[in-house]
A protein has these predicted regions:
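Hydrophobic, aromatic-rich transmembrane alpha-helices
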Residues: 178-186, 219-227, 287-307, 350-353, ...
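Hydrophobic alpha-helical membrane-interfacial segments at the cytosolic entry of transmembrane helices
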Residues: 108-111, 200, 232-254, 290-298, ...
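Membrane-interface alpha helices of multi-pass inner-membrane proteins
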Residues: 160-163, 182, 194-209
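Perimembrane helix-loop-helix junctions
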Residues: 183, 192-194, 215-243
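Active-site lumenal/periplasmic loops and adjacent helix-entry segments of GT-C-fold
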Residues: 1-175, 210-214, 403-407, 434
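Hydrophobic/aromatic-rich transmembrane helices and adjacent perimembrane loops
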Residues: 81-84, 169, 214-216, 328-357
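Transmembrane alpha-helix segments characteristic
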Residues: 193-202, 219, 239-243, 303-324, ...
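Extracytoplasmic
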Residues: 359-529
Length: 529
């Protein structure tokens, strides 16, 4: 994480790692704009005038530090590092209360965070087609054993592809795992007094991570039904938990989430998640590997409590195989991976039982060898993915510091951002290209007319009219600049390599008709005032 968030390079540019090259830009824009523009509810700086329905609390916590004077990098990293520790600690405590102290809980933790499928086989293929080996993994862009879409590998590593780049998932899991811990103790171990604090924690989830709130709700519903069927008692406190959570969550859902999710692209039917190349069974065998193959015997040998707890995860998985909850089909993994965490717990419990039986049986001498092969198959894909993610950013190598990260902001654009921060109004609106790594939107907290469609589309936002307007502004300014400047409140217009790469920019018109307030090489910033 430390080498993935706008790392200053020796040439003055800012670098990122592979997984943060995309999403980080949007999150930094939200962090900086909440602090600089100080409006509530906050608006998208990538689409001015549109309230943010996305769970923004994961970013507003960093905005607090930025407002207090910390740098943008420090403000983004400090809460994220703390949240990451909470995720790991919360997951371990969940597995510990479920599986008991010892090897099973630790194994479950590693299976979840480092485990992977058989994707490594594509890189060590001995056939004529061959494989690129470790060099391809460590140097390719998203060609890892857990994220190789050309081969149908989508079972990403939770650390590299979810916790590091996806701040909402990171902060959501920081609350979700403690909630699951409390739920297990309250609903299965009958520590019913814990339903009340669980309701408060659960009710705080929607504006942190809506997917985590939904996942917790499904698992809780299954346990509630089981409680009713078994007539175990405690139904009143279980219902109190639900009422508290619903009362706290309702304003968040009604005022933010549901408004943005009203688009038809959010909720729709779809079978088999992202699989478009393989049969259902083979897709999960190669993506999840031994963890998937061991599930049937693990379920058969599991304790009643383990089967009951996993039942909610199984229902959640089934729902995710049938329903898509957001425009991006891939993002269903934010729900599926909650089921996967419970699957890892169930599998670890079974593997611990098998290990004990082998050590005490006739195969005790072969047990270490069998364990080594099993653990290698479980952890090789995830381990190689984490190695790739580390070297994809600027990092400490054997020969010293290596600047191998992806340039997300050039030195020229960084200087522009410094000028804008110091010399323009906080509520100024800029006409720029719609590149995702827009320095003004990322680093200054100012708004741009229209941001990257790769962000806005997956948030269910209608950005196409603004995108079309920008083309007219840059290519036919004599006819359209004044009209759209008034329509969208444009204060400044930028001409740089990004704009030239997007449109046939009429630079002669801008140079003759507008006041250039800042220039740096081939970059020029014009004022429309």
């Amino acid at each position: 994480m430390l080498n993935h968030v706008i790392v200053p390079a020796s040439d003055g540019s800012l670098h990122s790692g592979q997984s943060t090259y995309g999403d980080m830009c949007m999150h930094l824009g939200i962090i900086s704009s909440i602090s600089v523009q100080q409006s509530f509810p906050p608006e998208y700086s990538l689409l001015p005038g549109t309230a943010i329905g996305y769970p923004f609390l994961c970013d507003s916590v960093s905005s607090t530090f930025y407002t207090l004077g910390a740098g943008l990098r420090f403000s983004a990293l400090l809460p994220a590092m703390y949240a990451y520790l909470l995720v790991v600690a919360g997951a371990y405590l969940l597995f510990e209360v479920w599986l008991g102290r010892g090897g099973a809980a630790t194994l479950a933790l590693y299976l979840f965070f480092v485990g992977g499928g058989f994707g490594f086989a594509y890189f060590f293929d001995l056939s004529e087609a061959g494989g690129g080996g470790i060099s391809q993994i460590l140097s390719g862009f998203y060609t890892t054993p857990t994220n190789y879409t050309d081969k149908g590998i989508y079972w990403v590593n939770p650390i590299a592809d979810m916790l590091v780049p996806q701040r909402a998932t990171l902060f959501g899991w920081a609350l979700l795992f403690p909630c699951l811990h409390l739920l297990y103790r309250a609903a299965i171990l009958d520590e019913r007094r814990l339903f009340l604090p669980l309701g408060v924690l659960a009710g705080s989830l929607p504006l942190v991570h809506t997917h985590s709130f939904l996942a917790l709700g499904v698992i809780s519903l299954v346990l509630l039904i089981a409680n009713c069927l078994s007539l175990r008692g405690g139904l009143r406190l279980f219902l109190c938990y639900g009422l508290i959570a619903a009362a706290l969550a309702a304003p968040q859902l009604l005022c933010f989430t549901f408004k943005q999710a009203a688009s038809g692209s959010f909720l729709r039917l779809h079978w088999n998640w992202v699989n478009d190349k393989d049969s259902w069974l083979w897709f999960y065998v190669k993506n999840m590997g031994l963890i998937f193959l061991l599930m049937p015997p693990a379920l058969a040998c599991a304790r009643r409590e383990s089967r009951l707890f996993f039942a909610g995860g199984a229902l959640l998985w089934l729902i995710c195989e049938l329903v898509v909850f957001q425009p991006n089909l891939y993002d269903n993994n934010k729900l599926i991976f909650v089921s996967y965490a419970l699957m890892c717990g169930l599998t670890a419990e079974f593997m611990a039982k098998v290990w004990t039986a082998l050590r005490e049986g006739a195969l005790r001498r072969a047990a270490p060898v069998l364990a080594a092969f099993t653990l290698t198959a479980c952890f090789l894909s995830g381990g190689l993915t984490l190695a790739r993610e580390y070297v994809s950013g600027d990092h400490l190598g054997l020969g010293g510091w290596v600047e191998s990260g992806y340039q997300v902001v050039s030195a020229q654009q960084r200087r522009l951002a410094e000028y804008v921060s110091e010399n323009t109004e906080p509520d100024a609106v800029f006409a720029t290209a719609t590149n995702h790594n827009n320095a003004i939107a990322m680093l200054t907290g100012r708004s741009i007319v229209c941001g990257a469609g790769t962000f806005l589309y997956y948030h269910g936002l209608d950005y196409q009219p603004r995108e079309a307007a920008l083309k007219l502004v840059y290519e036919q300014p004599a006819e359209w600049l004044d009209f759209y400047a008034q329509e969208y409140g444009i204060d400044y217009l930028l001409v740089s390599s990004h704009e030239r790469g997007s449109w046939a920019v009429d630079e002669e018109y801008f140079a003759a008709e507008l006041d250039c307030v800042y220039s740096d090489g081939d970059l020029a910033l014009y004022s429309l005032k």
